């Protein structure tokens, strides 16, 4: 009997009337492989890529585009074959007929799996072989390409079984198509939806939650908790040649789906056909899995809508409403009777208790999320958003063994390889200031108009802890100017904070593209464009000054900013290939603050003849701007006397940027006009405003606490408050 089930004659017998399935799949794989390959290769030839580039692109084709096109048809095949093989379980007549045959259910199960596999595998292999032959005819053939084709077959076969058995499992535990469709949608979407809901709730109740950089369970649920998202993540890794770990996860998950669906099939009661759910205990579990998040989500929506202190009351109302509605709708579906909406009140009460517990975990922070900081000995390194902390927008540049460079922009700070660390983890003083920042978060709950009790300017700093165990923890802290300075000081003193800039400047000056600097007056100058020896001299001077600078030197007020760009050789990447370009290159960009202690740099820059600092700029007139409580310009005054202008220049900060470790006056600024008629905007340093300005304004500290967002609210969030003076 076993041999008969696997014989070609038996397959032809059971496939009568079903030939449209392999025919349809043959058409799909014809489009996914030969047609897609011909279209893409034709476009490459028209773009005039070099032969080496064409071979690189062709290898990438088998690791990227054909993975997607073939994968899409593979998923369609899994859906069609699973429906063809197991949808009969929803029909009482078909169940009675098939289960009356003298064939064991286990044999029947594997027969349907085997038949579906043939429907999928035969057209797949034919069309993939056809695509390989087309590539060989166009000059693309090697053992490596054959290996890529074989690996692609195995990858798609794994994806086929994953989706096939996940759908079969749904057929085996549900009794009608409506519930089957709902359960299948839930299987594919539940994990990501739950992850998003948990992230929203964490953002709403945990002030240190970093919503832009999910990690841990939040990232796991969003990216890996459903067959669809897990497959998408695997495709990305596979393209980069890093998919082995996720392939193992997919394989294990496929085995689980196979075993559970097999168990559910052979134990499925025949009389379950037509019923919404086959197994009562599973139905109860699914109900709780749906009702609890619905209650939480509805409560959170009602928590966000009001702006008054009654938001907690509305949150409770929303939780009750969401729990009752979700429970009632699911129960009505289970019993196929709307009168069952309020049935099973004990389960409704249990769900309400679970919703309450979850709400308390968030609202009361029972897990101490905001107060948590890893132990010092557990921390291996720190990831810091340096653009917020120090205004550093220098790219991450690292030279590879083959002489090429890897280049990532400053927004890549959260990657593990871009972390800062000392000789052995982080230093004691760095950890102490981090503890201080964490302890102060309780008084800085600014997201939902919490009570602000501190004065000063605040920024939101994104930070990541890399632990020795391999885990990572992401946080978003609100820090003031003093804490910015202390943290930077200790990072310079105990960690390798200088390394990023030093690695950037270590690039050979032969790759140098441009050097410019922005003076303290806000004007930019391209320098030494025709003197490469002076450019090299300047870079060496900056490198020397950075190495010799003490931490306190790097926390002074910068007098200018140096901009440097390199054009560096990089590894060939199919996504950035330029037709005909044999040696790919990429621009690396850096902005480096220049401090008064940089004597060597200053000496070289003086050769340009340009004014370096604000003090060296000839000022003709100054217009002082005063702002009201809303931050709108209220009054203005002009000054032209030399003594007054000198005093204003001494009190003004450079106009090329603001610095997190420097405190500024919140309600007054200036527009300076040079002798040449050029204007530059400047802020005033805290406590440095001349007396005649104070007399003119009456008070420079007249604005209430206000939240000001700059760019991304999660990366640079400013808050100016004078609460302590009240």
Q: What feature does the model see in each segment?
A:
Residues 1-90, 261-269, 300-310, 330-346, ...:
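Hydrophobic alpha-helical transmembrane segments
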Residues 39-61, 192-281, 294-316, 329, ...:
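Terminal transmembrane helical anchor/hairpin motif
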Residues 60, 67, 114-175, 179, ...:
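Secretory targeting signals
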Residues 85-118, 273-274, 531-550, 638-642, ...:
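Helix-loop-helix units of permease transmembrane domains in multi-pass membrane transporters
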Residues 290-291, 333-369:
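Internal/C-terminal transmembrane anchor helices
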Residues 362-453:
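Membrane-interface segments at or immediately adjacent to transmembrane helices
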Residues 442-481, 550-585, 658-684:
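Short, structured surface segments that line ligand/substrate-binding pockets
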Residues 719-726:
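Conserved small/polar residues in nucleotide/adenosyl-binding loops
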């Amino acid at each position: 009997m076993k041999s008969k089930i696997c014989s070609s004659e038996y397959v032809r017998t059971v496939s009568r009337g079903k030939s449209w399935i392999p025919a349809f799949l043959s058409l799909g794989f014809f489009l996914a492989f030969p047609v897609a390959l011909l279209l893409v290769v034709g476009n490459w030839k028209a773009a005039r890529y070099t032969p080496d580039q064409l071979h690189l692109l062709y290898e990438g084709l088998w690791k990227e585009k054909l993975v997607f096109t073939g994968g899409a048809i593979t998923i369609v095949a899994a859906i069609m074959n699973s429906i063809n093989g197991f949808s009969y379980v929803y029909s009482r007549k078909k169940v009675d007929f098939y289960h009356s045959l003298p064939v064991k259910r286990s044999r029947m199960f594997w027969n349907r799996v085997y038949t579906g596999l043939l429907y999928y595998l035969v057209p797949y292999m034919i069309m993939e072989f056809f695509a390989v032959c087309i590539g060989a005819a166009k000059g693309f053939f090697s053992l490596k390409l054959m290996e890529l084709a074989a690996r692609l077959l195995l990858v798609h076969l794994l994806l086929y079984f994953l989706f096939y058995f996940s759908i079969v499992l749904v057929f085996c535990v549900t009794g009608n198509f409506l519930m089957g469709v709902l359960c299948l949608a839930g299987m594919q979407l539940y994990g990501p939806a739950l992850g998003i809901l948990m992230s929203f709730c964490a953002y709403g109740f945990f002030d240190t939650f970093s919503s832009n950089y999910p990690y841990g369970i939040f990232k796991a649920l969003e990216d890996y908790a459903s067959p669809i998202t897990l497959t998408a993540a695997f495709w990305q890794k596979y393209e980069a040649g890093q998919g082995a770990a996720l392939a193992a996860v997919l394989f294990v998950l496929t085995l689980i789906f196979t075993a559970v669906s097999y168990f559910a099939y052979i134990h499925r009661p025949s009389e379950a056909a037509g019923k919404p759910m086959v197994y009562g205990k599973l139905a109860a579990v699914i109900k709780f899995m749906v009702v609890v998040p619905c209650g939480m989500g509805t409560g959170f929506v009602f928590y966000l809508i009001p702006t008054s202190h009654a938001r907690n009351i509305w949150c409770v109302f929303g939780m009750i409403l969401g729990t009752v509605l979700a429970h009632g709708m699911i129960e009505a579906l289970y019993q196929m009777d709307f009168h069952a909406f309020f049935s099973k009140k004990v389960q409704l009460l249990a769900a309400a208790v679970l919703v309450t517990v979850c709400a308390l975990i968030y609202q009361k922070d029972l897990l101490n999320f905001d107060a948590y900081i890893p132990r010092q000995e557990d921390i291996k390194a720190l990831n810091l958003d340096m653009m917020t902390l120090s205004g550093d927008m220098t790219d991450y540049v690292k030279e590879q063994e083959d002489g090429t460079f890897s280049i990532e922009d400053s927004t890549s700070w959260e990657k593990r390889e871009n972390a800062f660390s000392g000789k052995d983890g982080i230093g004691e003083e760095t950890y102490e200031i981090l503890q201080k920042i964490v302890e102060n978060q309780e008084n800085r709950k600014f997201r939902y108009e919490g009570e602000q009790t501190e004065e000063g300017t605040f920024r939101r700093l994104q930070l990541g802890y890399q632990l020795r165990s391999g885990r990572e923890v992401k946080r978003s802290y609100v820090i003031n100017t003093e804490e910015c300075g202390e943290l930077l000081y200790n990072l310079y003193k105990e960690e390798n904070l200088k390394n990023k800039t030093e690695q950037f400047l270590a690039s050979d000056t032969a790759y140098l593209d441009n050097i410019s600097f922005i003076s303290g007056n806000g004007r930019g100058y391209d320098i030494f464009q025709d003197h490469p020896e002076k450019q090299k001299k300047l870079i060496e001077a900056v490198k020397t000054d950075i190495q010799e600078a003490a931490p306190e030197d790097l926390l002074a007020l910068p007098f200018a900013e140096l901009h440097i760009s390199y054009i560096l050789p990089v590894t060939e990447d199919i996504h950035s290939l330029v037709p005909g370009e044999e040696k790919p290159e990429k621009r690396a960009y850096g902005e480096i603050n220049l401090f008064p202690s940089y004597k060597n740099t200053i000496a070289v820059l003086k050769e340009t003849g340009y004014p370096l600092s604000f003090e060296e700029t000839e000022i003709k007139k100054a217009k002082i701007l005063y702002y009201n409580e809303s931050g709108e310009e209220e009054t203005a005054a002009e000054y032209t006397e030399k003594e007054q202008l000198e005093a204003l220049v001494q009190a003004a900060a450079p106009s090329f940027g603001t610095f997190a470790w420097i405190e500024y006056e919140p309600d007054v600024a200036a527009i300076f006009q040079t002798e040449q008629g050029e204007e530059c905007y400047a802020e005033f340093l805290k406590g440095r405003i001349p007396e005649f300005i104070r007399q003119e304004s009456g008070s420079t500290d007249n604005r209430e606490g206000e939240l000001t967002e700059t760019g991304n609210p999660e990366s640079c969030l400013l808050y100016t408050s004078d609460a302590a003076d009240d």
